[in-house]
């Protein structure tokens, strides 16, 4: 009788363990959308909020949570009564929602300082999830650059308010002093090498500077210039730097200057590209193919 009771307990525990394993196997997938963030309400609505909504509408079986990676933006918004989660807080939120699988998608363009911070955070918590998938920044490889150029070109051609085919196009990025800044030069070289000699790349805070861009503009001898933000969120940088400093300086040199008023995050093509990346990651974590290697293609 005693042996039978022991056997019954063993069978019961085995069934419980099997059930728990199946629950973990079929556990919920959490999607973490990581944005640098912005204090510009209108820009946030047109980019971050719009992408968040599209992701939630597309992946209805997943829990979707956003995070801001810039502490300064989080603090600034908090003073206005707008609460945004940090990456660690957002991950905790997904845990609370019962997510055993994690997909991390950022809207960062370059593999810079903020991406390194995100990598460390994901590596720190990946042991807490059965499966984790995270992809590289939007501009990482030559193919990424080609795709971005193609999408920007499509967006410009679709906008009837400008005629980019008759203008010198200047993509204006943020820029930094990190090695990731070299990506801007790669894009500029790629444009010239693959048939767009009237397209140029400059940065607000890195290389190539506005001085370098002016030299390139002078070489083409077309007085019509279109400034295009190479920024996920145009926001204050477009208002103060692109539509301000850059436009005014080039106008003073005799150029006829127009500004394309959309950041990359407002472009439907860019949003769809990001959703495609998320779909591939969700498929990987749900099928068990994700190997917890962070920041793959």
Model-identified regions with their sequence ranges:
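Active-site-proximal alpha-helix that buttresses catalytic centers in soluble enzyme cores
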Residues: 22-297
């Amino acid at each position: 009788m005693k042996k039978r009771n022991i056997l019954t307990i063993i069978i019961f525990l085995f069934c419980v363990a099997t059930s728990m394993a199946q629950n973990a196997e079929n556990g919920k997938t959490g999607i973490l959308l990581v944005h640098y963030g912005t204090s510009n309400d209108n820009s946030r609505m047109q980019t971050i909020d719009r992408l968040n909504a599209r992701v939630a509408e597309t992946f209805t079986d997943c829990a979707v949570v956003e995070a801001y990676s810039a502490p300064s933006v989080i603090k600034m918004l908090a003073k206005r009564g707008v609460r945004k989660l940090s990456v660690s807080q957002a991950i905790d939120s997904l845990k609370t929602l019962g997510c055993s699988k994690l997909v991390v998608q950022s809207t960062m363009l370059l593999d810079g300082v903020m991406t390194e911070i995100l990598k460390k955070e994901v590596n720190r918590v990946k042991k807490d999830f059965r499966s984790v998938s995270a992809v590289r920044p939007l501009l990482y490889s030559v193919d990424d650059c080609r795709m971005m150029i193609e999408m920007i070109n499509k967006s410009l051609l679709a906008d009837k308010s400008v005629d980019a085919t008759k203008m010198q196009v200047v993509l204006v990025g943020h820029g930094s002093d990190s090695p990731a800044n070299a990506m801007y030069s790669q894009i500029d070289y790629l444009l010239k090498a693959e048939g767009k000699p009237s397209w140029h790349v400059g940065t607000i805070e890195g290389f190539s500077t506005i001085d370098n861009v002016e030299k390139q503009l002078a070489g083409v001898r077309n007085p019509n210039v279109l400034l295009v933000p190479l920024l996920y969120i145009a926001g204050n940088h477009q208002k103060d730097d692109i539509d301000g400093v850059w436009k005014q300086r080039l106008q003073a040199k005799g150029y006829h200057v127009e500004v394309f008023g959309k950041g990359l995050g407002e472009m439907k093509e860019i949003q769809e590209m990001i959703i495609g990346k998320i779909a591939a990651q969700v498929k990987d974590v749900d099928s068990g193919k994700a190997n917890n290697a962070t920041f793959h293609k």
